[in-house]
Regions:
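Generic low-polarity alpha-helical segments
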Residues: 1, 14, 38-43, 256, ...
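Bacterial Sec-dependent N-terminal signal peptides
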Residues: 1-23
Length: 349
């Protein structure tokens, strides 16, 4: 307890929690040993994020070019500032976060958009795709046994929502997944189903490389076209045009998980090439507002039928239906608060 109080005291000295700090981050080193270095002049501001009860949640770095970057204290070993301020060593616990074993599968799995990684014995591939100029495009969990996407997750903020290029349309196998577990574009031929994006092409138009990565087959699900271009397409537009941070000066972030059901009992059947046809498509969304320093979350459930009725549900209910633990890297008290309710005013429903 004494250590925690000293830690919080150090945080309050280093930062004014009611305003942006003039302290800039020099480096962040994670417990995995991975280090992130930042130029002082490339940063717009830095904020330490606290829970309403005063517990430390993490650090948010706003860069001038790439938008915001989040680091959770539960994953940080230490932080060094561009000043004489001493390093910060975080304290605190999070029972269900992606732990050191999970991070061996994917070292990016500490990020807020990640669900809890698969804990069973089946072969899975946890893959992140990124570009040098725009950072992470999206991450996936791929079920090798089922040859199916379990989920795709990504962030949406001003710096990675630029519209610089057009849709590339080149469907190819994921280069990070062994061919024996992969799906090729021609496996959809004659199936009667579209290659339905999870991380949409329209969400990643910063560069040709970034957009091309959304056409990896690991980011697809067999989808009825009238669902893909109808109900689901309208939901994608709402995420992009309403719920994601709007405006180039926004400092907010939307954390997105998109997926479809692939487990027995929740599928419609199989294509002639044994691809699973999901019974439901769904989303888990977590919004961070910088101005209010708060989070809100919502689950979206879309039966895989033409003109199906969309359900807006809590994340707790979505977890019950899917068996997946979403936003597990949030501290437990924040996670429990936002996942058990829907703020109708924030989401406009």
């Amino acid at each position: 307890m004494k250590r925690q109080l000293l830690f919080l005291f150090a945080i309050f000295i280093a930062f004014n929690v009611t305003a942006q700090s003039d302290k800039m981050v020099k480096s962040v080193t994670l417990k995995t040993g991975v280090a992130f270095n930042y130029d002082k002049d490339a940063q717009d501001s830095v904020r330490v994020i606290f829970t309403p009860s005063g517990d430390s949640l993490g650090i948010k770095i706003y860069t001038k070019r790439e938008g915001s970057v989040d680091f959770l204290y539960s994953q940080i070993h230490h932080v060094v500032f561009w000043s004489n301020q001493p390093s910060i060593i975080p304290d605190g616990t999070n029972v269900n976060k992606n732990n050191e074993i999970d991070l061996q599968k994917n070292p990016e799995a500490w990020r807020l958009e990640f669900p809890k990684l698969y804990q069973g014995s089946d072969i899975t591939f946890e893959v992140t795709h990124s570009t040098p100029n725009y950072g992470i495009t999206y991450s996936i969990e791929w079920d090798g046994k089922r040859r199916a996407n379990r989920w795709s997750c990504y962030q949406m903020y001003a710096g990675n929502m630029l519209k610089n290029v057009k849709r590339q349309d080149a469907f190819i196998e994921d280069p990070k997944i062994p061919s024996v577990y992969n799906v090729s574009p021609n496996e959809y031929s004659g199936s009667g189903y579209s290659r339905g994006h999870l991380c949409p092409s329209g969400d990643r138009l910063c560069s040709k490389e970034q957009n091309s990565q959304t056409f990896y087959m690991s980011n697809m699900q067999p989808q009825i076209q009238k669902h893909n271009g109808g109900v689901w397409g309208r939901l994608e537009n709402k995420v992009r045009g309403t719920w994601a941070p709007q405006g180039k000066d926004s400092k907010d972030t939307l954390y997105v998980v998109k997926a479809a059901t692939i487990d027995p009992g929740n599928i419609k059947g199989y294509t002639k090439t044994e691809l699973i046809v999901p019974k439901y498509f769904y989303m888990a969304l977590l919004y961070y507002s910088k101005s209010s320093n708060s989070y809100s979350a919502i689950g979206i459930w879309s039966p895989h039928e033409e003109n199906s009725t969309t359900e807006y549900i809590t994340i707790d209910e979505l977890e019950r239906r899917t068996g997946i633990d979403f936003f597990c890297n949030l501290p437990d008290n924040i996670e429990n608060e936002v996942e058990g309710k829907i703020d109708n005013e924030n989401w406009g429903i």
